[in-house]
C-alpha cells in the first residue's frame, strides 16, 4: 500500500515504514503527526484518487529528527568590475517515518 500526500508545497509518495525528509515542521522529536492532504491511496488492487483530496485519507508519521541539508553555494559575479560574491545556504528539514496509511 502506498499514498501520495502534500506537505510544504511538495508531493511525496510513501509506503508504511518509509523515511522521508520534509520541509521543516514545528513538531518535537518523537511526536506523531498526521497529514490529511492525501491526494492518492493505492493498495494492491484498488486506487483511490482524490478530487483534489481523498475523503478520509490520512498519513500518520513519527518525527525522527530535525536537521539541515547539504550546503548549496551561490556565486554572483560581474565581469570586468572586480566584483564577486559567494554565499551559501543550508535548508532546514524534518525527517519522519511513516507508521500508517488510512484510506
UniProtKB/Swiss-Prot annotation:
What is a single molecular function from GO for this protein?
Answer: structural constituent of ribosome
Q: Sorted alphabetically, which keywords does the UniProt record give? A: Ribonucleoprotein, Ribosomal protein, RNA-binding, rRNA-binding
Q: Name one GO cellular component term.
A: ribosome
- HAMAP family linked to this entry: Ribosomal_bL21
Stated family: Belongs to the bacterial ribosomal protein bL21 family.
Assembly notes: Part of the 50S ribosomal subunit. Contacts protein L20.
Function (record text): This protein binds to 23S rRNA in the presence of protein L20.
Listed name of the protein:
Large ribosomal subunit protein bL21
